UniProtKB/Swiss-Prot annotation:
It comes from Thermococcus onnurineus (strain NA1). The keyword Zinc-finger does not apply. Belongs to the Maf family. YhdE subfamily. The lineage of its organism: Archaea, Methanobacteriati, Methanobacteriota, Thermococci, Thermococcales. Its EC number is 3.6.1.9. This is dTTP/UTP pyrophosphatase. PANTHER family: BIFUNCTIONAL DTTP/UTP PYROPHOSPHATASE/METHYLTRANSFERASE PROTEIN-RELATED (PTHR43213), BIFUNCTIONAL DTTP_UTP PYROPHOSPHATASE_METHYLTRANSFERASE PROTEIN-RELATED (PTHR43213:SF5). GO terms for molecular function: dTTP diphosphatase activity; UTP diphosphatase activity.
Length: 184
């Protein structure tokens, strides 16, 4: 049994494009983490999520966590509209990194990794930022935007895996294929 340890509808949708038979069991892990380097931060949270769900239900478990970072700071999910505004203003006109750490526990062994994608935002006016915030879209997303939704308008270019920016890099699908899971 393949288990996705995530409540994210975006991760569920991407995995479902390539693998049909899996179960969703969200983890009960807090997303609080004292680590400050994006790769180690995302990997640690992915491992915690995968281990917690594996200990509850067994099977092959996928845990993932995505971190948006700029200037050495990790931007989590905004806690308020004002925080979303500050994040989007910080990203405006600049390049940032999106790092997704993943952990797959298969037959008791862990396979983990991290994927990094660079994203360049266009210059954003305050009017556009507030219009986007009023849609509600940024409030449950790291870095306060969703590239797959209205937030995609802000992106000038990306360097790397688009699906990583959404939160589920295709490297995970390839790892599952290597572990014997049927893809497509």
């Amino acid at each position: 049994m393949l288990v996705l340890a995530s409540a994210s509808p975006r991760r569920r949708e991407i995995l479902g494009r390539f693998i049909k038979d899996f179960k969703v069991v969200p983890s009960n892990v807090s997303e609080e983490c004292s680590l400050t380097e994006p790769r180690t931060y995302a990997l640690e949270l992915a491992r915690r999520k995968a281990r917690e769900v594996y200990n509850r239900v067994g099977g092959t478990v996928i845990g993932a966590d995505t971190a948006v970072s700029i200037d050495g700071h990790i931007l989590g999910k905004p806690g308020s509209e004002e925080e979303a505004y500050r994040m989007l203003k910080l990203l405006s006109g600049r390049v940032h990194r999106v790092t997704t750490g993943y952990c797959i526990i298969h037959e008791g062994e862990e396979v983990s990794g991290a994927v990094v994608t660079e994203v360049k935002f266009r210059e954003l006016s305050d009017e556009l930022i507030w219009a986007y915030i009023r849609t509600g879209e940024p409030m449950d997303k790291a870095g306060a935007y969703g590239i797959q939704g209205k937030g995609g308008l802000f992106v000038e270019w990306i360097n790397g895996d688009y699906y990583n920016v959404v939160g589920f890099p295709l490297e995970i699908v390839w790892k599952l294929r290597e572990l014997g899971f049927g893809v497509m």
